[in-house]
Regions:
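A conserved beta-strand-loop-helix scaffold within acyl/acetyltransferase catalytic domains
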Residues: 47-111
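A short beta-loop-alpha structural element at the N-terminal edge
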Residues: 30-42
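Conserved acetyl-CoA-binding loop-helix of GNAT-fold acetyltransferases
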Residues: 111, 117-132, 156
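Extended, hydrophobic alpha-helical segments in both membrane/secreted and soluble proteins
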Residues: 105-106, 141, 150
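Acyl-donor-binding surface of acyltransferase catalytic domains
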Residues: 1-28, 35
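Conserved GNAT acetyl-CoA-binding A-motif
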Residues: 132-146
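Conserved active-site alpha-helix within GNAT-family acetyltransferase domains
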Residues: 122, 147-162
């Protein structure tokens, strides 16, 4: 499996997927699926986490992703909610633009700043891997990291830059 960061450097897994799969949600936390109308929530989390430097750019990006998936976000984008039902994080999987068939990308990992560095990013990555398992014909996963914190998280989970 490979990982790609924003600078287009690649990574691969060290066969340490047990670090990813052996996660459980804290009491009261849950995953909810993205639904049409959730665009502002998604953009707010992405912008707050520093994935996008401009809120409007984040809004444009989610609509672009919706269009490319023709609105079929089922099992493609999720939110992590805390015990109060507040959406605090999100992650998405999309078909890769590479010419190789069956490649899925894990993208847009983001957590609100006060929830970062608490192990919750690992939960989102675990959920994304499980979502990829449900994609028919998925053969490989690319990871995309947009900031240094995401890159460090992926490396701590056993991925290496190629």
């Amino acid at each position: 499996m490979e990982s790609q960061e924003n600078s287009k450097k690649s990574s691969k897994s060290n066969n340490k997927l047990e670090k990813i799969y052996s996660t459980s949600l804290p009491d009261g936390y849950r995953f909810t699926e993205f639904r049409i109308g959730d665009e502002n929530n998604w953009a707010y989390i992405q912008y707050s986490a520093g994935v996008f430097k401009d809120y409007q750019l984040a809004i444009r990006r989610i609509f672009k992703e919706e269009n490319s998936l023709k609105g079929n976000f089922k099992n493609r984008c999720v939110f992590l909610e805390n015990e109060n039902g507040e959406r605090i994080g999100t992650i998405m999987i999309v078909p890769s633009l590479s010419e190789e068939e069956g490649v899925q990308e894990i993208k847009y990992l983001a957590l609100l700043p006060k929830y970062q560095e608490k192990g919750l990013g690992k939960l989102l990555i675990s959920k994304a891997y499980k979502m990829v398992d449900d994609v028919e014909g998925a053969t490989r996963i690319n990871l995309e990291a947009y900031n240094d914190k995401s890159i460090v998280l992926f490396e701590n989970l056993g991925f290496e830059r190629l």
